[in-house]
Amino acid sequence: MLTLDCIYRASFALKNVIRRTDLIYAPQINNESQIYLKPENLQYTGSFKLRGACYKISCLTEEEKSRGVIACSAGNHAQGVALGATKHGIKSLICLPEGAPISKVEATKRYGADVCLVPGVYDDAYQKALQLKEEKGYTFIHPFDDEYVIAGQGTIGLELLNQLPDVEVVIVPIGGGGLISGVAYALKSLKPDVKVYGVQAQGAPSMLQSIEHERRECLSSVSTIADGIAVKEPGEHTFDLCSKYVDGIVTVTEDEICAAILALMEQQKLIAEGAGAVAVAAAMFNKVPVTGKKTICVVSGGNIDVTILSRVIGRGLDMSGRSYTVTLDLHDKPGELMGVATIVARLGGNIISVLHERNNNSNVTACFLRLVMETRNAEHISLIRNALLEAGYTIVN
């Protein structure tokens, strides 16, 4: 049974193992609130998962260690287990979904683990890990539904209260629920009036649906850029703890996640993965009541694959009004392209791509013009659109 003493013991055990990440004041995230970030993306291995994994491994018996450990993960728990096992001289095997970011797969190998890639998502990797555990006798290290793991993650809650004693709101990502379970339990045990909110991706709301239906729900599928929280079913322990100690759960869209990643990069010079940015997205887009409150957003991880980072940035620019694509139906005559470009330039838009297409079967005297431009914000986009319409141009999209 999880107790506050368990979390204090975990904190002591992890004293020389993990980095106690400092809070970062980030007022630009939401100018109506006092926002602080808990940057666990700066943790060793790039996420909070190191805490729970290392504490669990430190509590294993010698017999359990001798059998080697096996774990399943979307990527971050894998790295925590791999590093923790290697430090203790223990053999480790990690089951990862085939779609896990290459950066997470390679990092897991570098930390000393063997890797088994499994078709599907996290839950499929979980079933494969259980199968191999039975066949080979490994000791299983659950990524979230284990009281030692939860206690390890709960050390973040202790740190938050030490760093900002008068905190009023804490926002935490939710996948399987290990992080928020430990953090919420620690916070509510020591400061019952603090509000704790969980955030899930809109495409993977397993804990939200479970809480709403008052029983654990297993989703048929999950789809989100936030691979670290793409979990079909929450754990038994985590569901019970969230039911008791979490004040509310919200979801954020893919575009909101991308906008949050971009904001963290530009404003705070922090790299967050999708799962790591959902708490910030919830604060940015007022998904939880933070107005006038001292609020901490847990940035849970930063292990984003650089091959998809450019796409994330592109969507973030679109979401924040920093990039705009417009398609116009023009008369095919000299000067039309120049006329459009002149309006955009006069209003401060910066055209970075032009596609001029004459192949319009419906009207031989017409053509399409598609422009991609850099803009300042949504109001700037509206100004450019209105100017084009007032000049007599037809906007298709």
Question: Would you name each region that the model predicts?
Answer:
Residues 1-397:
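PLP-dependent amino-acid enzyme catalytic core
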